[in-house]
Amino acid sequence: MDIIDTALPDVKLLKPQVFTDGRGFFMETFRDGWFKENIADRTFVQENHSNSSKGVLRGLHYQTENTQGKLVRVVVGEVFDVAVDMREGSPTFGKWAGATLSAQNRYQLWIPEGFAHGFCVLGDAAEVVYKCTDYYNPETEQVLIWNDPAIGIGWPLQTAPLLSPKDLAGKTWAQAEKSALRFPDKKCRPNVSDGIFSDRLPTRLQYALCKEKHPGNEERQAQPRSGGIPVLQIQRERRIRAAVGHREGNNKRHNYTNQAFTDNQACREKRTDTVGVFQTAFAVFRLLANDVFQHRRQHRACHDGHIDGRRQINAHTDRKDGQGKFTA
């Protein structure tokens, strides 16, 4: 993908590489490793899909807590997509950037955490799909009015937009509650080498680490759950725990494999021993059977010889006359 800068340095326009032929087209819309390396180290947890008719304007929406980063693209129609920086302390605080997203140009807009987001439909209808880095929280959702002159968004509208009751009741810039995500000034922002800031976009934990540099904002700044441990140290410990867990899992699998091999080997040895016992018993049985068979055959031969001798004697006796002579 190609990365295109916008009026806000943290808001990026992404142009995908599209392959077309007579059958249609193919493109890769998202690759996690590339996005984390080139745009922001974020994990998306929710994806939304909206359909809007002609003249609809949605926004400007943001959450003061559980701030959401959004990766927006259009799958049907065309919209003008807008982001407004709501981070106090940011060099672009209160400024906006916009881009035209359509199913034809297939652009995507990355809007980091701490920005308000909205869009208006430019054609007959539009379908918008966007990924979020945090879950939707209606309790902390805020609406910034779409036409506040203090911001001065240049919506490309021909007629008055169609708005929801919630968007109609949006607050002006002066009334709106700003994002809980703070952008610290350069004087209090520690060096990356100090192991405190791990990314270009600070987190609430990082703001809490330098809260003494932001007087008056203590009630909005969450206490670090880790007790003020630097972010890089936390990430390093998480990686170590993950590596240890992975190594332990491999060891368990290795042990299971060894145990299975040992059990299989023992089973084979046991089976071999059993076969040997049966073979020995069968050989002994054959020897005994042969001895018995030979003994019975010899006994039969003796018995037959004895019977033949008796028959011959009886035959001679029957052929003798009274004087002891044989008769014809």
UniProtKB/Swiss-Prot annotation:
<comment type="similarity">
    <text>Belongs to the dTDP-4-dehydrorhamnose 3,5-epimerase family.</text>
</comment>
<dbReference type="InterPro" id="IPR011051">
    <property type="entry name" value="RmlC_Cupin_sf"/>
</dbReference>
<dbReference type="InterPro" id="IPR000888">
    <property type="entry name" value="RmlC-like"/>
</dbReference>
<feature type="binding site">
    <location>
        <position position="141"/>
    </location>
    <ligand>
        <name>substrate</name>
    </ligand>
</feature>
<dbReference type="Pfam" id="PF00908">
    <property type="entry name" value="dTDP_sugar_isom"/>
</dbReference>
<feature type="binding site">
    <location>
        <position position="23"/>
    </location>
    <ligand>
        <name>substrate</name>
    </ligand>
</feature>
<feature type="binding site">
    <location>
        <position position="58"/>
    </location>
    <ligand>
        <name>substrate</name>
    </ligand>
</feature>
<comment type="subunit">
    <text>Homodimer.</text>
</comment>
<comment type="function">
    <text>Catalyzes the epimerization of the C3' and C5'positions of dTDP-6-deoxy-D-xylo-4-hexulose, forming dTDP-6-deoxy-L-lyxo-4-hexulose.</text>
</comment>
<dbReference type="GO" id="GO:0005829">
    <property type="term" value="C:cytosol"/>
</dbReference>
<feature type="binding site">
    <location>
        <position position="117"/>
    </location>
    <ligand>
        <name>substrate</name>
    </ligand>
</feature>
<feature type="binding site">
    <location>
        <position position="166"/>
    </location>
    <ligand>
        <name>substrate</name>
    </ligand>
</feature>
<comment type="pathway">
    <text>Bacterial outer membrane biogenesis; LPS O-antigen biosynthesis.</text>
</comment>
<dbReference type="InterPro" id="IPR014710">
    <property type="entry name" value="RmlC-like_jellyroll"/>
</dbReference>
<protein>
    <recommendedName>
        <fullName>dTDP-4-dehydrorhamnose 3,5-epimerase</fullName>
        <ecNumber>5.1.3.13</ecNumber>
    </recommendedName>
</protein>
<feature type="binding site">
    <location>
        <position position="28"/>
    </location>
    <ligand>
        <name>substrate</name>
    </ligand>
</feature>
<feature type="active site" description="Proton donor">
    <location>
        <position position="130"/>
    </location>
</feature>
<feature type="binding site">
    <location>
        <position position="70"/>
    </location>
    <ligand>
        <name>substrate</name>
    </ligand>
</feature>
<dbReference type="GO" id="GO:0019305">
    <property type="term" value="P:dTDP-rhamnose biosynthetic process"/>
</dbReference>
<keyword id="KW-0413">Isomerase</keyword>
<feature type="site" description="Participates in a stacking interaction with the thymidine ring of dTDP-4-oxo-6-deoxyglucose">
    <location>
        <position position="136"/>
    </location>
</feature>
<dbReference type="GO" id="GO:0008830">
    <property type="term" value="F:dTDP-4-dehydrorhamnose 3,5-epimerase activity"/>
</dbReference>
<comment type="pathway">
    <text>Carbohydrate biosynthesis; dTDP-L-rhamnose biosynthesis.</text>
</comment>
<feature type="binding site">
    <location>
        <begin position="46"/>
        <end position="48"/>
    </location>
    <ligand>
        <name>substrate</name>
    </ligand>
</feature>
<keyword id="KW-0448">Lipopolysaccharide biosynthesis</keyword>
<dbReference type="GO" id="GO:0000271">
    <property type="term" value="P:polysaccharide biosynthetic process"/>
</dbReference>
<feature type="active site" description="Proton acceptor">
    <location>
        <position position="61"/>
    </location>
</feature>
<dbReference type="GO" id="GO:0009103">
    <property type="term" value="P:lipopolysaccharide biosynthetic process"/>
</dbReference>
<dbReference type="GO" id="GO:0009243">
    <property type="term" value="P:O antigen biosynthetic process"/>
</dbReference>
<keyword id="KW-0119">Carbohydrate metabolism</keyword>
